[in-house]
Amino acid sequence: MIETPSLAEFYHQQLFADCVPFWFPRAVDEIHGGFLHCFDLDGSLVDDDKSVWAQGRISWMLLTIYQDHERRPEWLTWAESGLKFLTEKCVDFSDGRMFFQVLRDGTPLRKRRYAYSESFAAIAFAAHAAATGSEDSATKARHWFKKFTEWNFLPNNAPPKFTGARPLEALGPRMITLVTAQELELRLGKSADLTHWIDRCIHEIRTLFVKSDLQVVMENVAPDGSISDHFDGRTLNPGHAIEGS
């Protein structure tokens, strides 16, 4: 068994001697801003389309290691390039939501019926607010979190993907709302709204999705928490079970 200090050193080395040097500055798009993220093992670029999720998550990661590890100016500069790209290129101003995928220059390519780009933008702006003291970024973080929760939880906001013949509730929105609210609380401080969402999501995950008798966390359940005995209802995602814990 590897001792805990050895594990800490192992992961530290993997992150800062392997992962970060592979991605940066390779991923930074010096031409259009934001980040490229489709690379082969040898570092060659295999696709230059940009996931909007990735723009938020990469910006968040850079700002997190900037605050928690070392304040390298380039990490902040690169993260701010990602935030600028998100703000200027990734928002559909017809409804205020974000796109899912754009071309390298930011031309919109695809938009999903669900909203997750917004949640990753929220944590990125919250991290920037904490790193720089920017009230504008704090406001944007709260704005995108509100957009995300409204789209996922208010009735009739998202276009239906199924008929009402077999209604299901999904773990995904609760899982991401929980971790997003926790991250905003960490970086921006506690608030009644964030506490509400954290408590609600923990309660719903525990009461609807966790099946202690089966030792599983379901991905989709009936509205009353019962298991739907069909492919969608039997789906398990161990990664989501860990993430929701």
Where is each model-derived feature located?
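Glycan-recognition and catalytic cores of secretory/periplasmic carbohydrate-active enzymes
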Residues: 1-245
